[in-house]
Structures are given as structure tokens and as C-alpha cells.
Amino acid sequence: MHKTKIVTTFLINSDKILLLKRSQKVKSMKNLWAGISGIIEGDEKPVKRAKIEVYEEVGIEESNIKLIKEGDVILIESPQYENHQWEVYPFLFSCDNREVKLNWENSESKLISLNELNNFTTVPSLDKVLTRLF
């Protein structure tokens, strides 16, 4: 089975978490709601990749976020690819900034309460990733 290591990062502000809607331009999981995600490159530290992705996807610099929790790694079967798993490294950062500057990977953003997650069509097992952080 092939595994891809990725980070999935959530920003929290006043008990609201940031969700992003993946755009039509990305390779996988188009138009599904997700956290801030990215592939871990080589022997890169997952927390480093998480901070890079926050800046790339929503324009918030490392100095404006604070790590609250690094969740346990979770393996998620890929519905898109046969014999493939995502090895997900979950992160939760606090952030006072409510303004985001989306890049091409996402088309929309929303700050939601955890109990609102079921109202969104998300990437597979996003709820399970979140339970690693709360």
C-alpha cells in the first residue's frame, strides 16, 4: 500500500475553526471542505510544513499563529486512489487574525463551530482528524 504523508492544520479563533473549500484547480478532493493541508516533503518536520501551508494557503505568517496541539497521526484510506493511504499529521494553532488571503488551492473560507462541521461536505474523515485535536 502506498502512503502519502500530509499535514492537516486548523486555525482556531474565539472557539471557531477555519475551514477551506478546495478549488477546482487542485488535483484531488475538488470542492470539498478541509483544513489547511499539504504534502510533507522529504524528511521535513511536519510542524514546519504546517506553518508553510498556513502562509501559502491563507497568507498568515508564522509570527501570527501559536501551536496549541499536535495530534496523533491518523491513517485514512483514499477513496480516490486504489491501495493508497494518507498519513495525516494534525495540527491546531490559535490565530487572532480573522482575515485570510486565499491562494489558488481554495475558493472559499468559513469560521465555524465544531458542531457545524456536519453541515459541510468535507474531505474523507475530516471529523476523525479533528477528534485528534479536541
Regions found by a protein language model. Name each.
Residues 1-18, 39:
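Conserved N-terminal beta-strand and adjoining loop/helix that marks the start
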Residues 4, 13-15, 71-99, 110:
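Active-site-adjacent beta-strand/loop module that shapes the phosphate/pyrophosphate-binding cleft
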Residues 29, 36, 96-98, 108:
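Glycine-rich, flexible loop/turn motifs
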Residues 61-71:
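A short coil-to-beta-strand element that immediately follows conserved catalytic motifs
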Residues 90-94, 101-132:
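NUDIX/MutT-family hydrolases
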Residues 16-57:
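Conserved Nudix-box catalytic region and its N-terminal flanking loop in Nudix hydrolases
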